[in-house]
Structure formats: structure tokens, C-alpha cells
Amino acid sequence: TGRSDDRQPVDAIVVLGAAQYDGRPSPQFQARLDHALELWKLDLASYIVVTGGKQVGDRFTEAAAARKFFETKGVKDNLIFEENLGKTTYASLLAVSRVASERKIERVLIVSDPFHQLRAKLIAQEVGLDAITSATRSSVIRGGDAFQRNLQEAAGVAVGRIVGFQRVDSWTN
């Protein structure tokens, strides 16, 4: 996973949320949205699922900011599903699994940053999603920050594989 790109036809593209500022995606989130739109234009999925809640003081959820982006790019409202409560990857993907079950979505393509892909895929499997991944081509997170994120993700994957990602999520939130 990581820098791999497993893109192939699926039922839905799932865009994992990231920071947004008053409805405007952060550069990291924008890279995810742009990549998902590129995949959408390749006709790889019928639906887009946008994820992410909001932090204290926010007026908009990450999912609402993502929906607005896709609507301005011509994706029809009825083809976008919103998961707007999750504040963690685990919570968002657990909610996506419920949406997928309700909407008869069998296979999803998860879009996130390269360093985040393996953990996202493993969490998706734990919550019952049939998932493949497609990472953004590059991350706006570079240098020391990228190194730190990769270490955090590696630790998260290791611990999650041992005790389960649900337990890790409950410890950290």
C-alpha cells in the first residue's frame, strides 16, 4: 500500500477527511479531493463517499467541505454520500461500512495520503469493507513532518494489528 495505487473499478470512492478551514479544504485535504476527482473522471465508481466531522468551533464538517468541492466540479448531489460524524479514521470507516451496507456498495477505493494508506486499508478490513487504496501522488507533508507521520502510522499499524484498531481508537479518543 503506501505509494501503491490499486485503482480499478469499484462501487464507490471513499475520500478520508482532513482539516478544513471555514469550509475550505486544507492543502492536504485538497490533494485528496483532487485525486478522488481524477479517479471519478476515469469512471471508476458510481458514487463518492466523503468523510469527516468537525472540530470544536468549526462551522462546517470535513464531509460538507468535500461535498461542496465535488458539487462545484459537476458531481451530482445524489451520487455523493456524506459521513459527517467521524473524527478518526476508524470512526469514519466504521460509518462508511454502514453506509455501504445500506446502499448495497460492495467494494470501495479509499483515497488518502501515501503514509496513511496501509492503516486505512487495515481498518477498512476490520470494519468489514472490501477496500482497495489509491494514494495521492504526493503529500503536502514533507521533510521532518513526513518522517514523523510515517513513524506514527507504522506504530499505529503495528499496535492495531496486535490489539485491533477499534481498541487503539478507543485509547486515543
Q: What are the roles of these predicted feature ranges?
A:
Residues 1, 170-173:
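N-terminal secretory targeting signals
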Residues 146-170:
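A transmembrane-helix-recognition feature enriched in membrane-embedded lipid enzymes
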